[in-house]
Structures are given as structure tokens and as C-alpha cells.
UniProtKB/Swiss-Prot annotation:
NAD(+) binds at residues 124, 192. The iminoaspartate product is unstable in aqueous solution and can decompose to oxaloacetate and ammonia. The gene is nadX. It holds the Pfam family NAD_binding_3. Pathway: Cofactor biosynthesis; NAD(+) biosynthesis; iminoaspartate from L-aspartate (dehydrogenase route): step 1/1. It is an enzyme of class 1 (oxidoreductase). It catalyses: L-aspartate + NADP(+) + H2O = oxaloacetate + NH4(+) + NADPH + H(+); L-aspartate + NAD(+) + H2O = oxaloacetate + NH4(+) + NADH + H(+). GO terms for biological process: NAD biosynthetic process. Disulfide bonds: none annotated. HAMAP family: NadX (MF_01265). Gene3D superfamilies: Dihydrodipicolinate Reductase, domain 2, NAD(P)-binding Rossmann-like Domain. This is L-aspartate dehydrogenase. It comes from Methanosarcina acetivorans (strain ATCC 35395 / DSM 2834 / JCM 12185 / C2A). Keywords: NAD, NADP, Oxidoreductase, Pyridine nucleotide biosynthesis.
Length: 271
């Protein structure tokens, strides 16, 4: 049975734990790791059948087959290279870290060198399968428009640096428009989907992103438009925010669980 270690015990990490604990996913939940030991222990204590240990990252890496990162972009930079060198497969949720070309090349190189797999869930959007297919023929443009309630954008580096008072917004306001390479740094906890789209499509510099704060919204809305030699397609998702973290869409957690199921399933459906 696949032994899994989860790094990051927030909403997404918790949902994955509960999916394994409830028998929805047939795997061994071996260990948890979080910058807050108490948070990891609290999550472990809430489970009914699984009894994962709390471990420091070095110990966790030595004991598992698959690490699921659901912590932060900094965690990706620090943990994933170590895991790959140790022969662990890794699922990355904080995909925005890979906007760093040097890090991206390092991780892809290590995965190849050590015969490991890197998994990137679709996250809070749909259409990644179509984007993968379209890239085989050639894509001319990819645009992502993300609209969120102001509360879901609080604390983002871009918001803080520009002194934007989100709580005072009375109408829909465009906060950012530019390449995905800049968007994932400006809003690291909000637009990981931009990174996933970039990896599947035409890269971080050519993928265009617009981030909008909309006080009339109660959901996170992601719209993607893709054009190329295949034709054109568009997708729209209205996600309910996580009840624990308004910056995270519930669908992102479900996507991680689905990716884990796909890893374990001998039958693969879709691109």
C-alpha cells in the first residue's frame, strides 16, 4: 500500500487526510508535517481510523512513497528537492512556486534523474485536459480571469505593497493584469491555477492573468479562454470558498483527492 506523507495541515491537507481516513482513498496515511506542530497533532487526533505520526520533514521523507505538499511556495522550494533526491514522488499544490524558472528546471531535472513523478492537480479550474490536448497542435493565447470576494484577497503581497483597502471597495475592481509569472508572485495564495495553466499551455510569460476583487461575489470565479490551431474553447467555474480559508476554493481540495485516486487507479480516463 502506498505510504503517504502530507506537508501542510490546512484545509486541503485536512481534506486529503479525511478522504484516506474514510476509505475513499486506499493508501496509508503515514505522517503529517506542518510549521505548527500543534496544528498537525490536532488534525491527526480528529481522524477516526488513521493514526499518522507527526514528523520533521527529513524523517517524513525517509518513510514515505509519496509526499503531498499543501503548505506554501516556500515549502516547495525547501522540501521538494530533498524529496526527489530521496526517490519520493511528490504532488505539488502550491504550483505558483514553479514560476521560478531555475526552481522549475531543478525540480524537473531531479525528477528525471531519480526516476520520480511530479503531480500537479488541476486545482480550482476545469479545462486542463483540453489545454494539454490543444498544446499538441499549437496554442496562440491563454487568458485567465479570476474574480474573488475582497476577503479572499486579503494579505496578498500585491495588495499590501500597493496599500489597497479591500474592505472599502464598493464595486468590482481590477487589481492586477499581466503575465502569470508576475501574478503568482503578487497573489501566491490566490492564483496557483495560473501556474497550472501555464505549465499545461504556453508558459508563464505568455499566459495572461487578470485578478478582480468583487464585493458582490460570494464565490471564487475563474474564467479561461484558449485559442490556437485547434480552434477556441472557454471555461467558467464558480467555486465555493473553503469554509476554513476564503483564499482557497473547495474544488482545489477535491482536485487533490481526485489526483491521488488517479495515481492509485490502474484505469486512467481523460487526457
Amino acid at each position: 500500500m502506498l505510504k503517504i506523507g502530507i506537508v501542510g495541515c490546512g484545509f486541503i491537507g485536512g481534506q486529503i487526510c479525511r478522504a484516506i481516513d474514510g476509505g475513499e482513498v486506499s493508501a496509508e496515511l503515514y505522517a503529517l508535517c506542518d510549521s505548527s506542530e500543534s496544528k498537525a497533532l490536532e488534525l491527526a487526533a480528529s481522524l477516526k481510523t488513521c493514526k499518522p505520526s507527526y514528523m520533521k520533514i527529513e524523517e517524513l521523507i525517509r518513510g514515505v512513497d509519496l509526499i503531498i505538499e499543501s503548505a506554501s511556495q516556500n515549502a516547495v522550494r525547501f522540501i521538494v528537492p530533498q524529496a526527489l533526491k530521496a526517490g519520493c514522488d511528490v504532488m505539488i499544490l502550491s504550483v505558483g512556486a514553479l514560476a521560478d524558472e531555475e526552481l522549475r528546471d531543478t525540480l524537473f531535472g531531479l525528477a528525471k534523474e531519480h526516476n520520480c513523478k511530479l503531480y500537479f492537480p488541476s486545482g480550482a479550474v476545469v479545462g486542463i485536459d483540453g489545454l494539454n490536448s490543444a498544446s499538441a497542435a499549437g496554442i496562440s493565447s491563454v487568458t485567465l480571469s479570476t474574480r474573488k470576494p475582497p476577503a479572499g484577497l486579503m494579505g496578498a503581497p500585491y495588495v499590501v505593497e500597493h496599500g489597497i483597502e479591500l474592505e472599502k471597495l464598493e464595486k468590482k475592481t481590477v487589481l492586477f493584469e499581466g503575465p502569470a509569472s508576475e501574478a503568482v508572485k503578487a497573489f501566491p495564495a490566490n492564483v496557483n491555477v495560473a501556474a497550472t495553466i501555464s505549465l499545461a499551455g504556453i508558459g508563464f510569460e505568455r499566459t495572461r492573468v487578470k485578478v478582480i476583487a468583487d464585493p458582490s461575489l460570494f464565490r471564487n470565479v475563474h474564467e479561461i479562454i484558449v485559442e490556437g490551431e485547434f480552434g477556441k474553447f472557454s471555461t467558467r467555474v464558480e467555486n465555493l470558498p473553503s469554509p476554513e480559508n476564503p483564499k482557497t476554493s473547495y474544488l482545489a481540495a477535491l482536485s487533490a483527492v481526485s489526483t491521488l485516486k488517479k495515481i492509485l487507479n490502474p484505469v486512467q480516463i481523460g487526457t
